[in-house]
Amino acid sequence: SKIKALSGDTKSIDGFRPYLGIVDEYHAHKDDQMYKLLEGGIKKMKSALISVITTAGFDLKSPCFALYEYCVKVLKGVASNDSQFIYIAQMNESDDMWTPENWIKANPILEYDREALQNMIPIAATAKEMGGSTLRDFIVKQLNMWIQWTNDVYIKDMDVWTRAAVEKTLADFRGQKAY
């Protein structure tokens, strides 16, 4: 048995048959070729395993995000796949992203490293105040949340946007002028 690190050059692993293939930081992969080649390589192997280890990323058109969406469907029972073990560390949609105790859901090691959890508090405060790419990076890399974000957003303070929300339907605007 050998442990072999593979480069991103997928041509070098065509026909490769691993018992264990680990795709690390899948969010950074431009395409799904490495995953597909590993998947193809294990199909005739008994008890082979492919593991994808990654944080969330910035590209909602990436193969990693597509796999994430599929895995969420499996976890919710919308899709079925008994051959795949899925573990996604993330907060619930209703969780307040500024509550440090909620961060443990997205970053479970913080349960055992309370100093690291405390160290994240000023980082979060800075990200919230600065907005832009600093906030984006905090949300994606520390809270493991997928977001599509550009730095030239119209509304930088999402609290303002949230406070402006109203519960109206299109029917409420029938007959009204719209610009």
PLM region spans:
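Non-catalytic, compositionally simple segments
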Residues: D32, L37, K43-Y179
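Conserved RecA-like ASCE ATPase "motif II neighborhood" in helicase/translocase motors
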Residues: S1-K43, A164
